[in-house]
Amino acid sequence: MAGSRKVAREFTLQGIYAWMIGGADVTLIAANLKEDEQFKRADEAYFRTLLYGVLKEEDMLSSRIAPLLDRAVAELSPIERSILLIGAYELLHCPDVPWRVAINESVELAKKFGGTDGHKYINGVLDKLAQDVRAVEIEHAKKRD
């Protein structure tokens, strides 16, 4: 049975956070996360796609979300920034993930790991990004609704 993408996103968040805080090598971070007993529940391929993809594209992803923020990217908490990077990566690079799912999963990460109202901020920023990068998909959804 394939693992859960939801769990893969949670481990990706932990990996990006560890990379931001400690600056350790991503391969070492991934190896450490895989030792966690709960990792077997994760979709490992999706975890690798997200973790390595987000870190490879971090500058581009940050530049895409920066104009949508009310503060500098560097002023975001590491958790908020990590979640926004994951959501932005999914919106930009994972067309198999519906835009609503990408946003909702990021909001759920923020509710679980972020500050009190961080999920509202995450939702607002990613919704603006989706309006730009998934405009055709959103327009189709509006016509169906």
Swiss-Prot record:
Q: InterPro entries, from UniProt? A: NusB-like_sf (IPR035926), NusB_fam (IPR011605), NusB_RsmB_TIM44 (IPR006027)
Which family would the database say this protein is a member of? Belongs to the NusB family.
Record-level GO cellular component terms = cytosol
Q: Which Gene Ontology BP terms does the record give? A: DNA-templated transcription termination; transcription antitermination
Pfam families this protein is in?
A: NusB
Task performed by this protein: Involved in transcription antitermination. Required for transcription of ribosomal RNA (rRNA) genes. Binds specifically to the boxA antiterminator sequence of the ribosomal RNA (rrn) operons.
Question: What NCBIfam families does its record include?
Answer: nusB (TIGR01951)
- UniProt name for this protein: Transcription antitermination protein NusB
Here the disulfide bonds are none
Q: Which terms are listed as keywords in the entry?
A: RNA-binding, Transcription, Transcription antitermination, Transcription regulation
Query: Domain of life, per the record?
Result: Bacteria
Write out the GO MF terms: RNA binding
